[in-house]
Design a protein with these regions (language model features):
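Flexible, Gly/Pro-enriched loop and linker segments at secondary-structure and domain junctions
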Residues: 1-29, 49, 127, 135-177, ...
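Domain-scale detector for complete catalytic domains at protein termini or as standalone homologs
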Residues: 1-19, 23, 36-38, 57, ...
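Gly/Ser/Thr-rich phosphate-binding loops and adjoining beta-strand/alpha-helix segments
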Residues: 19-51, 67-84, 138-141, 163, ...
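Acyl-group handling in specialized metabolite and lipid biosynthesis
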Residues: 26-28, 37-44, 93-107, 195
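Acyl activation and transfer enzymes in specialized metabolism, enriched
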Residues: 37-64, 184-205
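Small-residue-rich loop/turn and linker elements
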Residues: 66-99, 127-137, 221-233
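Helical lid/core segments from catalytic subdomains that handle acyl or acyl-like groups
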Residues: 90-149
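Active-site-proximal acidic secondary-structure segment that organizes catalysis
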Residues: 107, 119, 163-219
Length: 238
């Protein structure tokens, strides 16, 4: 983790402007072609959710601005790696949050997600989970597989700058379109003091490219993402 010197930061002016806003959150939504991942998940008997979550988390970790957070002291910090914290629907219909540590080892991540999902789904009480203050080195993630929506809004506690600095990732039901490919809407909401629309566009570009190379990606995610980011000119600067 690295603390950013605001006074020496290129984003000093927009940061100081947007951090004062009552609502500093903005979001962008776009369609993603998930056909290759869907086919692979079907072919291998794997969970589409876990497979897609791995690709999303790996891709977004490559966009430096999406790893920036505001900590409890009001400092801007850059994390080396971000983990997904996603919503689980329990057997009784009540939602719970589930953080899974991230690794670029696909098999290890997949097995951890499946284990965490099953464990959380069986928990009788989640009150403690919702009350616990966690480190902001996560992406808050939610999936609504029942609806092919156009955009998404998320709840925020705007007085808590640290929690509000955590990006929200949302996606809906995938549908087969006229060309035979399955697509879904993916929404990214982020704190405008930390990043602009270009960073989210970069995130969509990396995800889209990884989705096109799904088979190669799951075999060697680092090499595929290295090549994608080199081609797109996406690199860490801080």
């Amino acid at each position: 983790m690295k603390i950013i010197d605001i006074e020496a930061w290129d984003r000093k002016t927009p940061y100081k402007n947007f951090v004062r806003y009552t609502n500093p959150i903005f979001s962008l939504a776009a369609r993603l072609d998930v056909e290759a991942v869907y086919r692979r998940s079907k072919r291998t008997g794997r969970s589409f959710f876990a497979d897609f979550l791995f690709l999303v988390t790996a891709s977004l970790n490559r966009v430096e601005s999406l790893r920036l957070r505001i900590n409890e002291k009001g400092e801007v910090v850059l994390y080396e790696q971000i983990a997904p914290s996603f919503i689980v629907m329990q057997e009784n219909g009540v939602i719970a949050t589930c953080r899974t540590e991230f690794t670029l080892n696909y098999e290890a991540f997949y097995q951890t997600v499946r284990r965490d999902l099953e464990k959380k789904a069986r928990m009788e009480s989640v009150q403690e989970e919702f009350n616990r203050k966690e480190e902001p080195d996560v992406f808050y993630t939610t999936c609504l597989p029942w609806l092919d929506f156009v955009s998404m809004s998320n709840p925020y506690h705007y007085e808590d700058a640290s929690a509000s600095s955590i990006p929200r990732l949302s996606w809906g039901k995938f549908v087969k379109e006229s060309d035979g490919h399955r697509r879904l809407t993916f929404d990214i909401a982020a704190h405008h003091a930390l990043l602009d629309g270009k960073a989210i566009c970069d995130a969509f570009a990396v995800m889209s490219a990884a989705l096109e190379e799904a088979d190669a990606f799951y075999e060697d995610p680092k090499s595929v993402l290295d090549a994608i980011c080199h081609k797109l000119g996406i690199q860490d600067k801080l």
